[in-house]
């Protein structure tokens, strides 16, 4: 194995950093040995209407966790109200850059405060109360941030659905969370192309068993030619928020620390997406504290997280983390390749971005474009880079460090999940030396362990590998799967008793650094977004020609993992490119373009045990081009199937 490179923070960065290595070690020790004391102190970063009576109450074996019992606060108050009586009132809160470079808008903290108050009153006018769900299906426009903050102001639970999801995927989320109201747009733009949103909502509601009485529509494209309007249900956002009789102030609801804040759907290893439920106090503290330390935020910084708010990264590190810290956050509607592959670098120069947080997928795609676009831009404003969504391979790390950061910007390679709410394992810039490809060390209060398949902790010195689990609760952890407490326990706490199981594998090196090795369950990480194998398989078998399908992940140069589908057709059906196109189309229709298979491998049959279980381990290896060391195949009902799949892989998919 090649010698690991260690990258130390520069003397200048260390001098001005929010934390030193010595302080990290002592604070981390306190956070593990005395979590009550540590978190009681850190909770003072937030404004509470009423102080808690108990910091932590938990029974991890039975998945019961409660933080800051009795404490009362409001998220929108912490993100807005407490800033507008300070000089932050006129500071940029959201810097919006449209899909088209000619469109941009800056909203100060007071601008956002004003809009959030008004829209909170609109929601109340249409019957939304504390505890009601509001489903949000919007493009990356300021109204998306305004809508979710307005929900938090009145105690409504928001559930944002990524605008790239299909009407069917949208319908499943409507059926599950039963929203009182939906906020959408007439459409959106992505890479210069219009995208359907209102039409998708119409289709989803037609098929849904839920009777949603109110749909509020933001005008984004202005194209009303194909817009279907249902009087008495559909209302224009700008008419409602511009109502002269609307009160300009909405008193923030006093929320219990454990009151639900939002539901965000994520893929699981079974077919049905699960609604990850986050609560108010612990979540906000987690994103507030991590944002301060991980991104080394300073009052004058302009910070840009490129994630869509439809994913957890956008919730935590575009909206709630930055705004609760009084930071200026860039919000980008577009894609890195439009109008050309220099768009990211243009935005950085346009706004003097200091901190840039993006996904390895984007970095790898931009690496492929060569240096032409980068060399035309300045990028001298950058001082810190971040990576999120999947492990970053050392080659991409080095390119990011040398070409984008000019070897002066530390990189925070952050490991966390929708379920964890906030960053769990990361370097702290200026404090923790980095190793390209390693997520490095745990954040305060996070106690990662590696366990073997029997659930025993692996405490050996030196390099070890195992299942990555968390040993004790942290404030921003999910509190449940919405409406399904059994699934919450079964998914995260049943496999290794007394531990939260992340679903990831990892290795820990001799220095205690963690290296994430990928999913160990049936979830595929495509461009940092989780796609459940079962979801894609269910979509494929909807085609009448398909008898059976098995879907696995395989290494992909750009996306990290691609989707590899083994498909068995029914007797007498011809396999051809037309059928392949039909299968790709049905996956796009049922889930969305993000889940389209990269490879469709026609399989005469699948490797199964005598009990009928598909041996996915073997399918993963074949998809990855690993034909040796397939393990024991003697338990297969027909071992010859494996050789046929290998031959076809070599012949047609090499």
UniProtKB/Swiss-Prot annotation:
Kindly list the GO molecular function terms attached to this UniProt entry.
acetate-CoA ligase activity; AMP binding; ATP binding; metal ion binding
Q: Which reaction does it catalyse?
A: acetate + ATP + CoA = acetyl-CoA + AMP + diphosphate
**Is Transit peptide set as a keyword in this record?**
no
Residues that bind CoA: 190-193, 313, 527
Q: How is it modified after translation?
A: Acetylated. Deacetylation by the SIR2-homolog deacetylase activates the enzyme.
Pfam family example for this protein?
Answer: AMP-binding_C
Q: Which UniProt keywords apply?
A: Acetylation, ATP-binding, Ligase, Magnesium, Metal-binding, Nucleotide-binding
Q: Does the keyword Repeat apply?
A: no
GO BP term (any one)? acetyl-CoA biosynthetic process from acetate
Residues at which ATP binds = 389-391, 413-418, 504, 519, 530
- Residues that the record marks as modified (N6-acetyllysine) are 613
> What's the stated role of this polypeptide?
Catalyzes the conversion of acetate into acetyl-CoA (AcCoA), an essential intermediate at the junction of anabolic and catabolic pathways. AcsA undergoes a two-step reaction. In the first half reaction, AcsA combines acetate with ATP to form acetyl-adenylate (AcAMP) intermediate. In the second half reaction, it can then transfer the acetyl group from AcAMP to the sulfhydryl group of CoA, forming the product AcCoA.
Q: Which family does it belong to?
A: Belongs to the ATP-dependent AMP-binding enzyme family.
NCBIfam families reported in the protein's UniProt record: Ac_CoA_lig_AcsA, PRK00174.1
Q: What is this protein called?
A: Acetyl-coenzyme A synthetase
Name the gene behind this protein: acsA
């Amino acid at each position: 194995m090649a010698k690991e490179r260690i990258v130390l923070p520069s003397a200048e960065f260390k001098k001005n950093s929010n934390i030193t290595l010595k302080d990290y070690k002592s604070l981390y020790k306190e956070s593990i040995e005395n979590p009550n004391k540590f978190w009681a102190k850190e909770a003072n970063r937030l404004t509470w209407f009423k102080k808690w009576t108990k910091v932590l109450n938990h029974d991890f074996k039975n998945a019961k966790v409660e933080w800051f019992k009795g404490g009362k606060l409001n998220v929108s108050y912490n993100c807005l109200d407490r800033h507008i009586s300070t000089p932050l009132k006129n500071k940029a809160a959201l810097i919006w850059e449209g899909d088209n470079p000619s469109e941009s808008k800056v909203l100060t903290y007071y601008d956002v405060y004003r809009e959030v108050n008004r829209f909170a009153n609109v929601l109340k006018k249409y019957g939304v109360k504390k505890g009601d769900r509001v489903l949000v299906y919007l493009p990356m426009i300021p109204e998306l941030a305004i809508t979710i903050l307005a929900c938090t102001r009145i105690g409504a639970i928001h559930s944002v659905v990524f605008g790239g999801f299909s009407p069917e995927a949208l319908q499943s989320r409507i059926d599950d969370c039963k929203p009182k109201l939906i906020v959408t747009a007439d459409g959106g733009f992505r890479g210069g192309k219009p995208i359907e949103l209102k039409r998708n909502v119409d289709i989803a509601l037609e098929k849904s068993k839920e009777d949603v009485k109110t749909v509020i529509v933001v005008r984004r494209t202005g194209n009303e030619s194909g817009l279907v309007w249902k009087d008495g249900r559909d209302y224009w956002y700008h008419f409602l928020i511009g109502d002269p009789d609307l009160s300009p102030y909405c008193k923030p609801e006093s929320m219990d620390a454990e009151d639900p804040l939002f539901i965000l759907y994520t893929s699981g290893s079974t077919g049905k997406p699960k609604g990850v439920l986050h609560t108010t106090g612990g979540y906000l503290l987690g994103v507030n504290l991590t944002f301060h330390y991980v991104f080394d935020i300073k009052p004058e910084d302009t910070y840009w997280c490129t994630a869509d708010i439809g994913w957890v990264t956008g919730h935590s590190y575009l909206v709630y983390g930055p705004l609760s810290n009084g930071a200026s956050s860039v919000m980008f509607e577009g894609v890195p390749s439009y109008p050309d592959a220099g768009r990211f670098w243009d935005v950085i120069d346009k706004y003097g971005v200091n901190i840039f947080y993006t996904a390895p997928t984007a970095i790898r795609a931009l690496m492929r474009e060569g240096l032409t676009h980068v060399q035309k831009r300045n990028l001298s404003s950058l001082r810190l880079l971040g990576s999120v969504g999947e492990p970053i391979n050392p080659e991409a790390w080095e390119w990011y460090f040398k070409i984008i950061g000019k070897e002066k910007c530390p990189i925070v390679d952050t490991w966390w999940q929708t379920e964890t709410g906030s960053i769990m394992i990361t370097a702290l810039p200026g404090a923790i030396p980095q190793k390209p490809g390693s997520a490095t060390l745990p954040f305060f209060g996070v106690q990662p362990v590696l366990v073997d398949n029997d659930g025993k902790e692996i405490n050996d010195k030196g390099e070890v590998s195992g299942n990555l689990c968390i040993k004790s609760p942290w404030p921003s952890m999910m509190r449940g799967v919405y409406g399904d407490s059994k699934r919450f326990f079964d998914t995260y706490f049943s496999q290794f008793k007394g531990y939260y199981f992340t679903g990831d594998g990892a290795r820990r090196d001799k220095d205690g650094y963690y290296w994430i090795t990928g999913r160990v369950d049936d979830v595929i990480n495509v461009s940092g977004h989780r796609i459940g194998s079962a979801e894609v398989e269910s979509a494929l078998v909807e085609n009448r020609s398909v008898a059976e399908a098995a879907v696995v992940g395989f290494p992909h140069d750009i996306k990290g993992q691609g989707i590899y589908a083994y498909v068995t057709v029914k007797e007498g059906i011809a396999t051809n490119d037309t059928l392949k196109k039909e299968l790709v189309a049905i996956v796009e229709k049922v889930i969305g373009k993000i889940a389209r298979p990269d490879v469709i491998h026609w399989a005469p049959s699948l490797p199964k045990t005598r009990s009928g279980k598909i041996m996915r381990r073997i399918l993963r290896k074949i998809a990855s081009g690993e034909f040796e060391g397939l393990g024991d195949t003697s338990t297969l009902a027909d071992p010859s199937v494996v050789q046929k799949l290998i031959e076809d892989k070599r012949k047609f998919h090499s």
